């Protein structure tokens, strides 16, 4: 009786749940925002990204969006980033809100991700001044 229960317990504790893995996507992006690493963030971009930074809004290619994000980090060097809110209940959609502290101000970063094939890609990235 103990062996089957032990097997079931080990089976569920040894394999991370998809819920845990989903949270890591936004956590990893938060770490990249803290480091100001536009290249690593852009690696998660879809082929086209709706990018809203402060008052500029448009749809850009992956390469263009990376350059715009790099320019943002040059103008606003990051100091700290933390996850404020995370929605990961839909298996094909992720949404996270980060608080980004920079040397020149505090921003609210909203990240919308959609699943394509077996990976999540950023389809919308919004960086707005935190009020």
Segments predicted by a language model, with ranges:
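Short, aromatic-enriched amphipathic alpha-helices that serve as compact interaction elements
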Residues: 21-37
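A short gly/proline-enriched turn/hairpin at secondary-structure junctions
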Residues: 51-58
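Extracytoplasmic
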Residues: 44-46, 91-95, 106-108, 120
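Short beta-strand edge/turn micro-motifs at domain boundaries
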Residues: 106-131
